[in-house]
Every structure is written in structure tokens, then in C-alpha cells.
């Protein structure tokens, strides 16, 4: 079933919308949640919460593409769960968040709605300008929380080369955001 048809089911308040979402994007959402939480049961719970949150937000929202929409909801729910579970512990997600936090705007004035939209556009433009391999590695690290070791294995690179590529890409992103007026 196409995304538009599934969104229409949500808008009609048809419970089959959840079943269709699960059929089409269940494994995708589980992958996102599992990468962050590293626990199958917790990931399943987050995926179910994702369906509920999607049900609660459509309507009023009407996403053009359902995959990034449910992916974003799932990722945010998983990050929230991770934060609750690991207030004292350090893990892969904490490392990822620390790495990316260095280059994202941090004060409240930079995080109003308009700035958030502008930042989203800047990030998308930045990512589009990267070579395909670099873009894929960057997204896998900072969206899916893949470890440097996983990325090195998948892309047939040394871990040190992946770490350096990520560092250089973060530095380029930081420079790009500063040129556009964001305080980082």
C-alpha cells in the first residue's frame, strides 16, 4: 500500500492504518529503536508507541512521506527512552549525542521554530553536498546511531579512517552552520 493511502486511512480514523504501517515500516522502526536501545523488548515497545504517536498526530498532520515521519517519531521516542534508562550509564548513543552536540546550536534563542526550520534546510543542503559514501556514513552514525566499528566493517574501512571522516565532516558542518549565522 502506498504512503498516501495509509495516511488517508489515518485521516479516516481506520484502525487498519496501524496494521498497514506495521506491515510496511515495522522492521524499519524496529531497526531504529534497536540501534538506540540495544534491547529487543524495549525496541518492540518503542515501535508500538510509535504507532500510537502516529495515530495521535495524524490528523492534524498530513505527512507527504510516511517513512521519514514514523522514523522521526520512533527515533525521538527511542532517544527519550534511552535518556530515561541511562542517566548514569554511557553507551553508543551517548557518544553519538556528544559528538553531534559540539556542532549544533545550543542556546534557546537558536531553537525557536523558525530557526529549527532553517536549521533543517541547512542540514539537508549540507548533506546533499557531501559525496554519497560520506553522506551515508554520517547519516548512519548520527541518525541510526551505528557504531564506528559497524561502519568500518560495512564500508571496508579502518575504524580510524571512519572516525577521521566523521570528525572532518562534523567540522565542515560546524563551519557551514557558522557561515549561516548559527552560534555553535
Predicted region positions:
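DNA-recognition helix of helix-turn-helix
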Residues: 65, 134, 143, 148-182
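Residue-level preference for hydrophobic side chains embedded in well-ordered alpha helices
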Residues: 21, 25, 29, 50, ...
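Structural recognition of an alpha-helix C-terminal capping motif at a helix-to-coil junction
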Residues: 31, 45-52, 56, 64-76
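Amphipathic, Lys/Arg- and hydrophobic-enriched alpha-helical face
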Residues: 22-40, 127, 179
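Amphipathic alpha-helical segment used for protein-protein interaction
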Residues: 12-15, 106-139, 144-146, 153, ...
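A short, charge-rich alpha-helical start-of-domain segment used by transcription regulators
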Residues: 7-31
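Arg/Lys-rich amphipathic alpha helix in sigma70-family domain 2
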Residues: 72-94
Amino acid at each position: 500500500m502506498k504512503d498516501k493511502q495509509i495516511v488517508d486511512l489515518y485521516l479516516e480514523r481506520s484502525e487498519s492504518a496501524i496494521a498497514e504501517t506495521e506491515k510496511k515500516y515495522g522492521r524499519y522502526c524496529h531497526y531504529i529503536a534497536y540501534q538506540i536501545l540495544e534491547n529487543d523488548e524495549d525496541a518492540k515497545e518503542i515501535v508500538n508507541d510509535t504507532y500510537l504517536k502516529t495515530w495521535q498526530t495524524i490528523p492534524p498532520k498530513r505527512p507527504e512521506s510516511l517513512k521519514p515521519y514514523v522514523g522521526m517519531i520512533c527515533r525521538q521516542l527511542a532517544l527519550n527512552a534511552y535518556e530515561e534508562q541511562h542517566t548514569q550509564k554511557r553507551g553508543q548513543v551517548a557518544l553519538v549525542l556528544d559528538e553531534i552536540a559540539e556542532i549544533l546550536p545550543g542556546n534557546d534563542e537558536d531553537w525557536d521554530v523558525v530557526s529549527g526550520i532553517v536549521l533543517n534546510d541547512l542540514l539537508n543542503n549540507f548533506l546533499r553536498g557531501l559525496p554519497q559514501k560520506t553522506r551515508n556514513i554520517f547519516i548512519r552514525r548520527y541518525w541510526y546511531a551505528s557504531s564506528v566499528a559497524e561502519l568500518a566493517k560495512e564500508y571496508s574501512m579502518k575504524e580510524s579512517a571512519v572516525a577521521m571522516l566523521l570528525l572532518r565532516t562534523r567540522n565542515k558542518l560546524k563551519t557551514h552552520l557558522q557561515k549561516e549565522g548559527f552560534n555553535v
